[in-house]
Amino acid sequence: MTIYYLKPKFQGLLRPISDWLATHGVTPNMVTGTALVMSIAEGIAIWRFPTAVWPLLLLPVILFARMALNAIDGMMAREHHMQTTFGKWLNEVSDIVSDLALYAPFLVFFIGLLPKALFFMFLCCIILSEAIGIRGYRYGTRRYDGPMGKSDRALWMSVYSLSIVLLTVSGTWIFSFCYSLALYVAVWITIGRRYEGVLANMNEKRNEMERRSA
């Protein structure tokens, strides 16, 4: 299960905004760039002011806005005939860069070497997970399998950000360990599911080619 499956309903709410932007000279790449700059700015704020509360409270808002912008740029590209190869890859690269910019500063909040190491590996696995998902393009479909896709990461990092502010237990080693371990395990499950999905798509495409050549 992944929050990604709620995307069609989310897009339905945002479609009027997407249509308005498309008819007023805004391009999908502009929207993608806005989301990227916003994410980097928030990441810098968390890193620069680790003892301040406002960057942590702002993160869920920024992540929600980023998800909205990500949905809007895709709708604009598809529904208003603005799709380009450059735009597709800009979107993929900016998603990875945005995730790392937003989440890497949280290394300072995890207590103890092991939780920090687990969270660091989680960050590395984000890249692997998305790379496997992107590989799916070669076989006809981009893989968005969960349970730790982009939207899921946004949800659970928002929860962690708020827990730092609201829960004293977030400052303990056991909380840091359990949370970082859960993220790490979930992203590996995601990697496995996406890999299996890519293999299934590859075999399906191969079988289709064999049927055509028979």
Locate each region found by the language model.
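Hydrophobic alpha-helical transmembrane segments
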Residues: 1-61, 101-214
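Glycine-rich active-site/cofactor-binding loop and its immediate structural neighborhood
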Residues: 52-88
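Basic, amphipathic juxtamembrane/active-site segments
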Residues: 75-115
